[in-house]
Design a protein with these regions (language model features):
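Non-catalytic, solvent-exposed segments at the cell envelope interface
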Residues: 2-8, 25-42, 46-327
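Alpha-helical transmembrane segments
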Residues: 10-23
Length: 327
């Protein structure tokens, strides 16, 4: 798989901010204008319905499972006062989000609630790194860490970057396709012109510059690496481009019309350990300041190679050896 929702938790929070604005309809008495009064009442009722859908979805989403020590660490984070990191894991399956599989999207979103900045760091799926608690120091593909569970993927990235990652979001192929379609498609700025192959889901002619994608086209754009000279390095950049496009579309006024459907879809195909109260606190912070978020994207890079991997005994595999550069 190769992305999802954008940073699904960030996408969700931004969408929630828009929905929350609908609740803040000014109350104004207009004597003798009963029709206007009924209209305002109807709008308030509609806004209440949106917020009910939002809260219900939040309760459904926050159902991730993890070790007790990780739960305690996540619960202790004050998301309105201190920077925090969220691991976005895109697994390579359709359907049930609880399946354990390879993590082909590995993005760390570091959020600063005070400065309203989000840093997205993409790590290639083929990054050649040790898997803590599994490989005994032997290197493996980062994507293989996902087969040992979400906590193992988080530990691998924490060791690689020497950072704490208290939160995670898991999404899959289905998450991306359905959320992009509910948004009415997205406009993605591609650095390159290329054609995706059937192994990426479908054949799509991608042009350099702006492309309008539906869900399946966006997934194919994110999955393709064989047609790219830089392979997995470029694919990571393409994933970030899709996330940014989804965030931009989620902040448009049209999201209000599709609000309940989007929220329902996110709840069905997303798993996170961020609590309902923490997500709601992020909403509160935004409403208090109403300042926009600045999103910065960077990607870890490396050198393509063929090496033996701990989790695969059938021979050497294509990997990316880290070179210590993030750009």
């Amino acid at each position: 798989m190769d992305i999802s929702g954008g940073a699904a938790v960030v996408l969700l929070v931004l969408a929630l901010l828009i929905f929350s604005d609908a609740e803040r309809i000014p109350e104004k008495e207009v004597p003798g204008r009963s029709i206007l009064g009924l209209l305002i009442s109807a709008l308030l009722l509609l806004a209440s319905y949106y917020m009910f859908e939002v809260r219900t979805a939040l309760n459904d989403i926050t159902d991730g499972n993890e070790a007790p020590e990780r739960k305690e660490a996540a619960a202790a984070v004050n998301v309105s006062e201190e920077p925090f990191s969220v691991y976005i894991s895109g697994i390579d399956v359709y359907g049930d989000i609880t399946q354990q599989s390879r993590s082909d999207v590995n993005i760390i979103a570091t959020v600063n609630p005070k400065t309203k900045q989000i840093l997205l760091v993409t790590t290639p799926r083929d990054y050649y790194v040790p898997i803590p608690g599994v490989s005994n120091g032997a290197p493996d593909k980062l994507t293989h860490a996902g087969t040992y569970g979400i906590a193992t993927s988080m530990a691998t990235l924490e060791e690689l970057y020497q950072v704490d990652i208290p939160f995670y979001v898991r999404v899959n192929f289905t998450s991306l396709i359905e959320m992009v379609d509910i948004l009415g498609g997205i406009d993605v700025d591609s650095e390159l012109a290329f054609t995706t192959g059937n192994d990426s889901g479908m054949v799509v002619e991608v042009k350099e510059g702006l492309n309008h994608f539906n869900g399946k086209e966006a997934l194919a754009f994110c999955r393709e690496r064989h047609a790219l000279a830089e392979g997995d390095n470029q694919r990571g950049k393409n994933q970030q481009a899709v996330i940014e496009a989804m965030l931009k579309k989620a902040m448009s006024p049209s999201i209000l019309i599709k609000g309940p459907r989007l929220i329902d879809q996110v709840s069905g195909n997303t798993e996170t350990n961020m609590s309902t109260s923490q997500l709601q606190e992020l909403v509160r912070v935004q409403l208090a300041g109403m300042k926009g978020w600045n999103v910065i994207s960077v990607a870890a890079e490396g050198t393509s190679s063929t090496q033996y991997c701990y989790s695969y005994s059938g021979g050497p595999l294509s990997v990316i050896v880290p070179d210590g550069h993030i750009g």
